[in-house]
């Protein structure tokens, strides 16, 4: 899982197995961020439509979660259209993943230990940041 800024540059990366749901990985990813301060808002897809996650991010990190509601949502909507305008900027995180796919060791996980793979992902993020400077 990765978190990027408004330019698509990496702010945090976290490596986990493929089995946990993405909402379970948000907090560990925010704890492993490269900067001291947390981002103002997180923009996610419909999988992040979770009221407990929204409250948890707001209370622990002061982060606003922007995610469109699922079509099967039974509770009342918590976001209006003004907040969801920021969802259009979600392509920037997809650009970060495209940049990460330029590194062969990151595309397919060949490493047995997750620490080694995390090191490769962090090295790729460092190269991306150096290219931006």
PLM region spans:
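Conserved, well-structured core segments
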Residues: 1, 12, 97-98, 118-122
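A residue-level signal for conserved active-site and pocket-lining positions in enzyme catalytic cores
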Residues: 8, 94, 123
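Helix-centered, glycine/charged polyanion-binding patches within enzymatic domains
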Residues: 19, 37-113
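Active-site beta-loop-alpha junctions of metal-dependent nucleic acid enzymes
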Residues: 14-36, 41
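Well-ordered beta-strand positions
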Residues: 3-4, 14, 92
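Charged phosphate-binding loop/patch that engages nucleotide di/tri-phosphates or the phosphate backbone
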Residues: 120-133
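Short conserved beta-strand segments at catalytic cores or DNA/RNA-binding microdomains
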Residues: 1-10, 19, 26
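Short small-residue beta-strand/loop micro-motif enriched in glycine and branched aliphatics
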Residues: 10-13, 108
């Amino acid at each position: 899982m990765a978190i990027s800024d408004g330019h698509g540059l990496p702010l945090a990366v976290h490596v986990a197995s493929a089995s946990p749901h993405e909402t379970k990985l948000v907090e560990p990813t925010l704890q492993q961020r490269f900067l001291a301060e947390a981002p103002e808002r997180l923009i996610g897809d419909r999988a992040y439509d979770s009221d407990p996650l929204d409250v948890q991010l707001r209370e622990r990190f002061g982060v606003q979660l922007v995610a469109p509601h699922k079509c099967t949502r039974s509770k009342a909507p918590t976001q209006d259209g003004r907040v969801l305008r920021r969802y259009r900027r979600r392509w920037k995180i997809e650009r970060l993943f495209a940049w990460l796919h330029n590194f062969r060791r990151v595309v397919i996980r060949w490493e047995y230990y997750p620490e080694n793979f995390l090191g490769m992902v962090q090295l790729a993020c460092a190269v991306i940041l150096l290219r931006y400077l």
